[in-house]
């Protein structure tokens, strides 16, 4: 029928009377006549661009009166990771989306709008530019901002992609429409929540802003509007959103402001549709709008209509059989199309009656744009190629460009009478979800690479997570240490946070020195000391910091004295008693020179009567007066610098475990002091698996993972030995309390264990299988994204951060 309609419309546009083909029903003839009347457009030509916009009034609460008795609302919804999800998760999303569609009855019209709109590149550049601060590092900030702009240019962040659902109902008045619209809105928000999709209702100003941006795609005109301006100016809301003009000079293109556009509809001819079709349309890197108008058909009417169709087909079948008998043919031989249609109609009837399917009428529209006619035609050709790839056709809306354009507005007002009947499952195949983006615009959002699926910048703020604790995992050469250094540098330049690094391989010295940080070299030959007995009044959230410090000293003594069985109960008792005694003296006059050292504990133990106290004192002796007395000194370095690195590379096997535990306690002291000052503390632990090897350091690490969040601490474990990490008894606690994981290339044995631990799909796992340097998966809360970080190698920061031996040597020689 629609082919006939197109021919009639084109051929007879200037004729007043059209003879309808006799085989069309009265309803079909009326439908054709309506479209032709619209196509003529010579009886109701709008006098202005404002008049062309087909709504009557926008209310501040977001309700729009489109016609005398038709009211609509718009919801903006975010994306979820459908394309990257496991097969069972994709099935679950699809089934939930089917239920979502089935919510709409025939009294609710709705429209899905997918808008890809170019935005001013300078706006994005402003978002990624790092503001200057009053320190010596603004040249580095400039360099880092330049790097971000270069990365931005590689992606298509200049294209803003948004998704909307607009729904509308018929009502006699605003008073009657409002409560029902609110009720539908609440149900829809709950349905989105079940899908795991974040959604928000647009108010009137936001809806106007959206239409303004759509009408001003090519000129980047700013939206300036306030409700209070209307009475004073005598203007209508349309004056604030309309372009300079609309022009429809040809039958298949239009001009809107300074931009060319073309409206097309998707002719669905494929027997089977793919869930990739909509995704491919939305992946086009040009300004465009994809719109789906969907109208649910009353179930009884749909069933009745199909039954009528079956009856008509049966009648035709009988006629064909009679014809066959008269002609002397076998009456069972009937046209194959007739048999196929009959079979399909019966299958459809069964679906509607017993398989929770509904019938929908779908109009699928695509608006392509271009700065020139040539660019427009190129974009239309690309969209047509996508349709043909899936055995469908993209047809231009000849003589209906204006109606098509206005049907793309988020008003749920369909002015195009080209509809395709589809069941729930067929309609749901246009799954409106592809891949989630992680581009946060807060001032503390940090750079983590480009989204491997969309090539857009990944910028996130770990502080926005419920649990900002993190892990950086990767095989040697995958970019693990570089990623940690990049985050450290970024955090130092962007935030006011303090940064502490536990560095077992002396890899971070150059970076720390670049930012005038403090490198504390802890080794038997060093003259830099940190005191494991350091304490401050904020050490515990309770009123008694000594009790928590005693717990740490017990862990320390466990490493020194414990052996396989650990400390005995009596030994724990005497240690606890002595700790309270020596700190009681300190808190009576808390000056630095009164801070206890290990020798004070050693002497206090010797003063006790129990033989167990003397046993512990004897074990401590080598760390107090012997050759391992490194930790029997008061702290003599600046541990309050914004950036502190504890270099423990030269600690021998005997001291390394103790050194790591002491560093952890120093960090805890810093975190507690910073919390009191309202400051966050980032703590990076390289070779993190070593901390989980020993029971005491593992238990302390788990405590850090559990308690840091409340105190403004953001710990990050970095390791290449994933097997050792995963073999720890504490690993479950670590993973359960980590909402941020930066996973680079993984060894074959580790991949499957991680997949089981983190519920990673085989497709997701492919991004950490034989992946290149700086490539992998980012876990941010519930979002999993593949990333690629091609950090420019010509920057000074790169030379400081690289761990490649040849590049490190070149940097030293330079």
What are these regions (language model features)?
Residues 480:
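Conserved lysine of the Walker
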Residues 758-813:
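Conserved P-loop NTPase
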Residues 483:
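Hydrophobic positions on the alpha1 helix immediately C-terminal to the Walker A/P-loop
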Residues 80, 87-106, 113, 117, ...:
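P-loop NTPase motor domains
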Residues 472:
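Hydrophobic anchor at the beta1->P-loop junction of P-loop NTPases
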Residues 1-435:
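Extended, folded cores of ATP/NTP-driven motor/assembly subunits in large transport
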Residues 490-500:
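Post-Walker A helix-loop "phosphate-sensing" segment adjacent to the P-loop in P-loop NTPases
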Residues 516-520, 730-743:
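A short helix-turn-beta junction within AAA+ P-loop NTPase domains corresponding to the substrate/partner-engaging
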């Amino acid at each position: 029928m629609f082919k006939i309609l197109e021919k009639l419309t084109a051929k007879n546009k200037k004729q007043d009377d059209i003879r309808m083909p006799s085989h069309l029903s009265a309803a079909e003839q009326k439908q054709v006549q309506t479209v032709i009347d619209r196509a003529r457009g010579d009886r109701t030509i709008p006098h202005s661009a404002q008049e062309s916009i087909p709504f009557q009034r926008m209310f501040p609460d977001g309700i729009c009166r489109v016609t005398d008795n038709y009211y609509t609302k718009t919801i903006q919804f975010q994306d979820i990771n459908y394309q990257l999800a496991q097969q069972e998760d994709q099935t679950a999303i699809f089934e939930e989306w089917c239920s979502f569609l089935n919510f709409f009855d025939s009294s609710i019209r709705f429209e899905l709008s997918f808008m890809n709109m170019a935005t001013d590149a300078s706006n994005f550049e402003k978002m990624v530019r790092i503001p200057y601060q009053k320190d010596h590092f603004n040249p580095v900030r400039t360099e880092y901002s330049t790097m971000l702009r270069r990365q931005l240019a590689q992606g298509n962040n200049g294209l803003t992609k948004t998704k909307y659902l607009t729904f509308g109902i018929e009502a006699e008045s605003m008073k009657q429409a409002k409560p029902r619209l609110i009720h539908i809105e609440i149900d829809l928000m709950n349905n989105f929540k079940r899908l795991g999709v974040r959604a928000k209702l647009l108010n009137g100003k936001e809806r106007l802003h959206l239409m303004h941006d759509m009408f001003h795609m090519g000129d980047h005109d700013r939206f300036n509007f306030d409700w209070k301006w209307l009475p004073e100016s005598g203007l209508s809301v349309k004056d604030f959103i309309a372009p300079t003009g609309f022009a429809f000079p040809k039958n298949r293109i239009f001009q809107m402001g300074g931009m060319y556009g073309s409206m097309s509809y998707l002719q669905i001819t494929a027997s089977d549709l793919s869930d990739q079709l909509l995704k491919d349309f939305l992946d086009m890197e040009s300004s465009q709008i994809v719109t789906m108008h969907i109208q649910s058909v009353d179930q009884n009417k749909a069933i009745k209509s199909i039954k009528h169709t079956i009856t008509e087909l049966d009648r035709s079948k009988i006629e064909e059989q009679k014809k066959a008998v008269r002609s002397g043919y076998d009456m069972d031989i009937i046209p194959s199309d007739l048999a196929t249609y009959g079979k399909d109609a019966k299958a459809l009837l069964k679906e509607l009656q017993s398989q929770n399917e509904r019938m929908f009428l779908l109009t699928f529209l695509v608006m392509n744009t271009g700065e020139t006619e040539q660019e427009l035609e190129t974009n239309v050709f690309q969209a047509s190629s996508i349709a043909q790839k899936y055995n469908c056709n993209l047809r231009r809306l000849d003589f209906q460009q204006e109606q098509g354009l206005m049907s793309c507005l988020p008003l749920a007002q369909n002015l195009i009478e080209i509809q395709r009947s589809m069941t729930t499952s067929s309609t749901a195949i246009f799954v409106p979800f592809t891949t989630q983006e992680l581009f946060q615009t807060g001032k503390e959002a940090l750079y983590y690479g480009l989204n491997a699926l969309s090539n857009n910048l990944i910028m996130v703020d770990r502080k926005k997570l419920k649990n900002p604790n993190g892990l950086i995992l990767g095989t040697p050469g995958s970019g693990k240490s570089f990623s940690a250094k990049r985050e450290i540098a970024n955090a130092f330049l962007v935030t006011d946070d303090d940064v502490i690094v536990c560095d077992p391989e002396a890899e971070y010295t150059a970076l720390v020195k670049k930012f005038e940080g403090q490198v504390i070299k802890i080794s038997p030959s060093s003259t830099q000391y940190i005191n494991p007995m350091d304490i401050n009044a904020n050490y515990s959230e309770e009123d008694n910091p000594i009790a928590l410090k005693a717990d740490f000293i017990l862990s320390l003594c466990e490493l020194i004295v414990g052996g396989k069985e650990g400390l005995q109960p009596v030994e724990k008792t005497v240690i606890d008693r002595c700790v309270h005694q020596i700190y009681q003296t300190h808190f009576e006059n808390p000056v630095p020179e009164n801070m206890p050292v290990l020798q004070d504990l050693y002497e206090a133990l010797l003063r006790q009567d129990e033989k167990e106290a003397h046993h512990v004192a004897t074990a401590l002796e080598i760390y107090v007066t012997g050759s391992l007395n490194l930790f029997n000194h008061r702290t003599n370095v600046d541990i309050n610098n914004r950036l502190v690195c504890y270099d423990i590379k030269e600690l021998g096997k005997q001291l390394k475990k103790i050194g790591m535990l002491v560093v952890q306690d120093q960090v805890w002291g810093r975190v507690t002091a910073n919390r009191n000052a309202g400051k966050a503390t980032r703590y990076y632990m390289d070779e993190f698996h070593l901390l989980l090897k020993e029971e005491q350091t593992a238990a302390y690490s788990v405590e850090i993972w559990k308690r840091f969040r409340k105190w403004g601490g953001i710990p990050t474990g970095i390791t290449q030995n994933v097997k050792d990490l995963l073999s720890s008894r504490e690993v479950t606690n670590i993973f359960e309390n980590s909402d941020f994981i930066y996973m680079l290339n993984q060894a074959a044995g580790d991949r499957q264990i991680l997949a089981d631990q983190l519920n990673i799909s085989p497709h997701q796992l492919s991004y950490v299988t034989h992946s290149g340097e700086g490539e992998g998966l980012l876990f941010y809360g519930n979002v999993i994204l593949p990333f690629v970080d091609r950090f420019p190698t010509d920057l000074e920061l790169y030379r400081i951060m690289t761990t490649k031996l040849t590049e490190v040597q070149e940097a030293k020689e330079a």
